[in-house]
């Protein structure tokens, strides 16, 4: 569950 966190940070 590390990609979801990274994606959320990149999207926001």
Curated annotation (Swiss-Prot):
Domain of life: Bacteria
Protein name, as recorded: Putative PyrE leader peptide
Organismal lineage: Bacteria, Pseudomonadati, Pseudomonadota, Gammaproteobacteria, Enterobacterales
């Amino acid at each position: 569950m590390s990609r979801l966190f990274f994606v959320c940070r990149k999207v926001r």
